[in-house]
Amino acid sequence: MVKLFSYKIKYYLTAFFIIIIQSCASVEHKPLVDGITTAIAPNIIPKIKNGSLFQEKTPINYGYQPLFEDHRSHNIGDTITVVLQENISASNSSSSNLTRDGKANVGVTVTPGTLNPILGLNVNDNKTGIDSIGKNDFSGKGSNSAKNTFTGLITVTVKNVLPNGNLKVIGEKQVAINQGTEFIRFSGVINPNNINKNNLVASTQIADTRIEYVSNNRINDIQKMGWLQRFLLKISPI
């Protein structure tokens, strides 16, 4: 019986330490741009010509280029170069001052008035006063500022063509440096009219933009806080 009890104690202690170690580990990063980051153009079977002057149009004209039109990507699988020009800054400040003053004065008769002549007391000597003064002051100030700058180039692929002609694009760039890999992921919706003749479009002209820049090196793991540490930080009184 003693051995069985000792075995259970060791089992529970081992499980407890495993949970503690896992809780102190870093939390897995959830990608901002999820899913496959490329698109392949589907195989389109061309319509068979029947000799008529009015031919049925192929759903997507891959390789077709109008005579008087600049070449612009507009089909699934086409590539577009995005010029990253993100420069965002924000600031916020607040202050508050609270003051509260309170004062109370209470007079109490020590002895009955009929005993004043016997004790030789006048009316004023037969009273005692209780004064209470309270004051509460609070002053608080806070400020917050953030500035993010992201510049560069990334070539993305047209993933889908929306019914109104806008292009849903997605792309990823990976750069291996020493023992870590840098990931740049991008997704958004492009209006084909914003694509210039060099097949470039600014990131500021793209809707529903998702830009992610992460790495899987050791420094990135060190900067993450485990869920147990975050829980203890929330309930800590200091």
UniProtKB/Swiss-Prot annotation:
It comes from the Bacteria. The keyword Signal applies. One of its GO terms (molecular function) is cytoskeletal motor activity. It is found in: Cell outer membrane; Bacterial flagellum basal body. One of its GO terms (biological process) is bacterial-type flagellum-dependent cell motility. A lipid is attached at residue 24 (N-palmitoyl cysteine). Pfam families: FlgH. A lipid is attached at residue 24 (S-diacylglycerol cysteine). InterPro entries: Flag_Lring. Keywords: Bacterial flagellum, Cell outer membrane, Lipoprotein, Membrane, Palmitate, Signal. Residues 1-23 form the signal peptide. GO terms for cellular component: bacterial-type flagellum basal body, distal rod, L ring; cell outer membrane. The basal body constitutes a major portion of the flagellar organelle and consists of four rings (L,P,S, and M) mounted on a central rod. Assembles around the rod to form the L-ring and probably protects the motor/basal body from shearing forces during rotation. This is Flagellar L-ring protein. It comes from Buchnera aphidicola subsp. Schizaphis graminum (strain Sg). The lineage of its organism: Bacteria, Pseudomonadati, Pseudomonadota, Gammaproteobacteria, Enterobacterales.
